[in-house]
């Protein structure tokens, strides 16, 4: 876990314009005033392990959630899926999804965890592959903020054009627009992309929060264009919520996992406009959780409030979309809050609830599996499941034109993420990389400005 040792560093008045190189120590100079600055110290070694945990936790949760993806979406419109799953369905036979042609998942005959052993390889999916691509682009271009051209060129290079390309609806529309020469953020404009309210941006941008530890405002600035590549309005705000959660995961206050998760969630809630349906979904879901009712009852209440009764301005049902908008950002955001609140920071419990909650169940599970996996690291994940896992990842299952025929390792992926974060800490956050102690020093505020 990250250690939050607070270091007080004295800023000295520069008395001359000498060009001496600064020492590799915890000292930085200020030319205007003498004041103490509080720094948060983060071990780069520990952070690399946590990035490994992000990729591993996300992979476990993604593939487990895929077993029940679109099995249960409610009973409105032409497609009806019967009663939602409950905790009693864990370990029982999987039921067919809306596109399963009457057959259960080929990943597992039962609703259960999906693992890859040490001799196997994790496959990429749409919940991991665009994030992998964005990390690759940041690393390759040696930039913290990608340009519209870099995003478009990256998509066109790494996403397959004609065969199965594992893109969801807004991502596919944005990809089509890119082929026509249109650049982000116009690819996510409501005027050009009718799917701007869908879940796609959440699939692709949470990772930016990890590149700006403890600094969600910088993480959001980095993620702004990738988010707007495929989303606007409420879907954009929801994506910013997840980016904020990921950035705040770097703060280890010494509290329990449940306390940390709920504090992070309450802080992230502030990015949602109070009058918006995402904010009201958050408040309603949290209220039901705090009332002590079972998670299934909260999930059912969310379904009736937002899909049946269309309250708080959530009117997806009235649009008569395929599967009643089962892939919309809103209802899946609400479903993700159920597993977040009731999972209480427990990785296995959170994945189980997310898998059973309904709708696009692999997405919330991947989101929280990656978040909690980051918080507890590789060793924490292995301890939770009492086993070892594969460290290999095949990005070419869904994408193309990456090195080594697409076979990567979590060690290499986390090392790249560490280098990307190095640049953000130095250039965007204004922190210090202490080479001798292998630490980041993240500035908080001048001590004399603390209230």
Q: What do these predicted regions represent?
A:
Residues 60, 64, 71-92, 231-234, ...:
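Catalytic phosphate/nucleotide-handling subdomain of diverse soluble enzymes
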Residues 19-26:
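Bacterial lipoprotein signal-peptidase II cleavage site
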Residues 67-113, 128-130, 152, 162-165:
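Active-site-surrounding "flap" and adjacent substrate/cofactor-binding loops of secreted or lumenal enzymes
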Residues 118-126, 130, 135-239:
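Active-site cavity-forming subdomains of large catalytic enzyme subunits
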Residues 15-17:
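C-terminal motif of bacterial Sec signal peptides marking the signal peptidase cleavage site
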Residues 39-42, 174-196, 205-215, 224-229, ...:
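Accessory "access/gating" subregions that flank catalytic or transport cores
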Residues 48-52, 178-188, 194-202, 211, ...:
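Mature, well-folded catalytic/scaffold domains that follow N-terminal targeting or propeptide regions
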Residues 28, 279, 283-317, 322, ...:
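Acidic, carboxylate-rich catalytic segments that either coordinate divalent cations
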């Amino acid at each position: 876990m990250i250690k939050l040792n607070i270091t007080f560093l004295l800023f000295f008045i520069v008395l001359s314009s000498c060009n001496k190189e600064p020492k590799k120590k915890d000292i930085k100079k200020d030319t205007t005033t003498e004041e103490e600055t509080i720094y948060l110290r983060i071990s780069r070694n520990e952070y690399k392990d946590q990035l490994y945990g992000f990729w591993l936790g996300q992979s476990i949760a993604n593939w487990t959630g895929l077993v029940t993806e679109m099995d249960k979406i409610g009973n409105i419109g032409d497609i009806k899926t019967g009663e939602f799953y409950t905790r009693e369905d864990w370990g029982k036979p999987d039921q067919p999804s809306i596109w399963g042609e009457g057959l259960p998942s080929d990943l597992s005959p039962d609703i259960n965890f999906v693992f890859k052993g040490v001799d196997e390889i994790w496959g990429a999916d749409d919940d991991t592959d665009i994030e992998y691509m964005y990390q690759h682009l940041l690393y390759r271009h040696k930039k913290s903020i990608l340009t519209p051209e870099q995003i478009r060129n990256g998509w066109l290079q790494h996403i397959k054009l004609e065969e199965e390309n594992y893109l969801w609806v807004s991502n596919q529309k944005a990809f089509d627009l890119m082929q026509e020469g249109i650049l982000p953020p116009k690819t996510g404009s409501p005027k050009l992309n009718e799917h701007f309210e869908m879940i796609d941006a959440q699939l692709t941008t949470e990772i930016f929060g990890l590149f700006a530890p403890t600094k969600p405002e910088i993480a959001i600035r980095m993620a702004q264009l990738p988010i707007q590549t495929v989303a606007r309005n409420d879907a954009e705000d929801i994506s910013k919520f997840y980016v904020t959660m990921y950035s705040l995961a770097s703060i280890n206050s010494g509290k329990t996992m449940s306390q940390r998760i709920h504090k992070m969630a309450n802080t992230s809630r502030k990015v949602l406009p109070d009058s918006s349906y995402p904010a009201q979904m958050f408040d309603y879901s949290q209220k039901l959780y705090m009332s002590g009712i079972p998670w299934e009852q909260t999930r059912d209440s969310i379904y009736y409030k937002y899909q049946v009764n269309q309250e708080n301005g959530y009117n997806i049902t009235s649009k008569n979309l395929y599967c009643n908008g089962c892939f919309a950002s809103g209802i899946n955001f609400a479903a993700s809050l159920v597993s977040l609140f009731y999972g209480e920071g427990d990785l296995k419990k959170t994945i189980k609830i997310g898998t059973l909650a309904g709708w696009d169940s692999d997405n919330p599970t991947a989101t929280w599996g990656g978040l909690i996996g980051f918080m507890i690291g590789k060793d924490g994940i292995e301890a939770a499941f009492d086993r070892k896992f594969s460290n290999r990842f095949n990005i070419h299952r869904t994408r193309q034109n990456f090195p080594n025929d697409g076979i990567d390792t979590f060690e290499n992926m986390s090392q790249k993420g560490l280098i990307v974060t190095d640049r953000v800490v130095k250039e965007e956050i204004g922190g210090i990389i202490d080479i001798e102690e292998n630490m980041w020093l993240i500035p908080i505020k001048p001590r004399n400005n603390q209230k």
